[in-house]
UniProtKB/Swiss-Prot annotation:
GO terms for molecular function: ATP binding; metal ion binding; protein folding chaperone; protein-folding chaperone binding; unfolded protein binding. GO terms for biological process: chaperone cofactor-dependent protein refolding. This is Co-chaperonin GroES. SUPFAM superfamilies: GroES-like (SSF50129). It comes from the Bacteria. GO terms for cellular component: cytoplasm. Induction: By heat shock. Heptamer of 7 subunits arranged in a ring. Interacts with the chaperonin GroEL. InterPro entries: Chaperonin_GroES, Chaperonin_GroES_sf, Chaprnonin_Cpn10_CS, GroES-like_sf. Together with the chaperonin GroEL, plays an essential role in assisting protein folding. The GroEL-GroES system forms a nano-cage that allows encapsulation of the non-native substrate proteins and provides a physical environment optimized to promote and accelerate protein folding. GroES binds to the apical surface of the GroEL ring, thereby capping the opening of the GroEL channel. Keywords: Chaperone, Cytoplasm, Stress response. It is found in: Cytoplasm. Belongs to the GroES chaperonin family.
Amino acid sequence: MAAISINVSTVKPLGDRVFVKVSPAEEKTAGGILLPDNAKEKPQIGEVVQVGPGKRNDDGTYSPVEVKVGDKVLYSKYAGTDIKLGGDDYVLLTEKDILASVA
């Protein structure tokens, strides 16, 4: 079986799903103490890189997703599916898992 090469630009979320590049975890505390990998909090903020067409309504039309590519979003801690591509961390979320858009 041939290996599949996946690029971020080829990921097309379905329905009301949103593909988010996770912001890096904090490397040290406010006091300057370096954190080991096992003590770092899982980030809950990231940048939207791909958006699905939206939730399908009963009449066949779509309700578009409220966020757009480039938006920074805050999402639930244990939400979505974690994906690693090209050394970067991503998460595939449903729109309901997004808590807020961050300016």
